[in-house]
């Protein structure tokens, strides 16, 4: 989101719906950038930890249990018991939770078959596509072209190089598709604040994956040391810690700065895979990753500028109507 979105779009959603921002001293811009980078490192490192757990547990078990623990942790942080359930629009929550579950389980399946940076790059096509769909500008063709070029470069053309797993690619693209659905579903009014929407959505996603968790072989092994600690660490690194850091960072970051910086996540994912998992990328794949990052940054900047221009034009139009003279 990118790993489980993760946290980036959830946090923007929560912020847009009136999240209860903690009463903390506003950080400087440099501190805010540092906190956001630390949050992204936490998210992508959680993907690395998940790949380690795949050696001991089925992918579906890791995915389902991680989502369950994350839901519990965020419920405690956001005090889910304060929700007025009479106001909840369950149709929006259900679509949001289904998108979360699909995105989570398909991405974990993807990183089980692909290098972390490659999987994140393919998944990133989902939100990039949504952004480009809603941004009708002349610059859009540049970002679409860069994204397509990046996808092409992801494939190893060297015959001696190890080919990418086609099933893994499909999983990553599927995760990206669910990520796109997740973004659209997150814009639907749920009747409650953004933080509570995230909590209920995660519990819905957990319920969807619960049968998988119950039927998982070797489930009792999860409760043995040190695996229980690993799963808690996975949930904290993927949700609780980045949420907290990004909440503080957003106090002194514009949406443009936030969106541009989070476009670096594919690169951070690749670096995490290289450091912790010794995952090597071809130079063409590294170039592809940077190309997709550039497309995302460019899309973020031009979309934000276009939005600001529209808002300015609307204000001028309203002012002219109010003062016909």
Locate predicted features.
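Glycine-/small-residue-enriched transmembrane alpha-helix faces in small-molecule transporters
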Residues: 1-61, 95-98, 102-106, 149, ...
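C-terminal-most transmembrane helix of multi-pass membrane proteins
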Residues: 22-25, 67, 227, 263-325
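Hydrophobic alpha-helical transmembrane segments of multi-pass integral membrane proteins
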Residues: 30-35, 61-76, 140-146, 167-171, ...
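Hydrophobic alpha-helical transmembrane segments of multi-pass membrane transport proteins
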Residues: 37-45, 49, 77, 94-109, ...
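Hydrophobic core positions of alpha-helical segments in small-molecule transporters
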Residues: 38, 65, 96, 122, ...
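A helix-boundary/kink motif common to multi-pass secondary transporters
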Residues: 58-59, 115, 193-194, 254-255, ...
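Specific alpha-helical transmembrane segments that line the substrate/conduction pathway
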Residues: 61-64, 68, 108-138, 175, ...
């Amino acid at each position: 989101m990118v790993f489980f979105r993760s946290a980036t779009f959830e946090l923007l959603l929560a912020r847009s719906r009136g999240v209860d921002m903690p009463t903390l001293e506003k950080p400087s811009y440099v501190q805010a950038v540092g906190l956001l980078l630390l949050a992204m490192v936490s998210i992508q490192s959680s993907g690395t930890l998940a790949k380690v757990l795949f050696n001991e547990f089925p992918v579906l078990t890791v995915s389902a249990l991680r989502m369950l623990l994350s839901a519990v942790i965020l419920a405690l942080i956001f005090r889910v018991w304060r929700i007025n359930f009479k106001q909840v629009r369950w149709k929006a929550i259900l679509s949001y939770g289904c998108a979360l579950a699909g995105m989570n389980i398909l991405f974990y399946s993807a990183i089980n078959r692909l290098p972390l940076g490659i999987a994140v790059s393919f998944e990133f096509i989902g939100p990039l596509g949504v952004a480009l769909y809603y941004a009708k500008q002349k610059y859009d063709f540049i970002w679409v072209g860069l994204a397509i070029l990046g996808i092409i470069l992801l494939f190893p053309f060297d015959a001696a190089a190890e080919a990418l797993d086609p099933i893994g690619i499909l999983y990553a693209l599927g995760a990206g598709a669910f990520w796109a659905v997740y973004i659209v579903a997150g814009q639907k009014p749920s009747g409650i604040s953004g933080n509570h929407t995230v909590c209920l959505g995660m519990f819905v996603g957990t319920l969807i994956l619960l049968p998988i968790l119950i039927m998982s072989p070797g489930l009792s092994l999860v409760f043995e040391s040190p695996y229980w600690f690993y799963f808690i660490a996975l949930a904290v690194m993927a949700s609780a810690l980045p949420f907290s850091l990004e909440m503080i960072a957003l106090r002194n970051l514009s949406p443009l700065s936030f969106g541009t910086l989070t476009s670096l996540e594919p690169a951070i994912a690749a670096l995490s895979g290289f450091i912790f998992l010794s995952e090597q990328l071809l130079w063409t794949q590294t170039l592809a990753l940077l190309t997709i990052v550039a497309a995302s940054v460019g899309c973020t900047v031009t979309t934000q500028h276009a939005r600001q221009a529209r808002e300015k034009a609307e204000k001028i139009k309203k002012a002219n109507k109010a003062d016909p003279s």
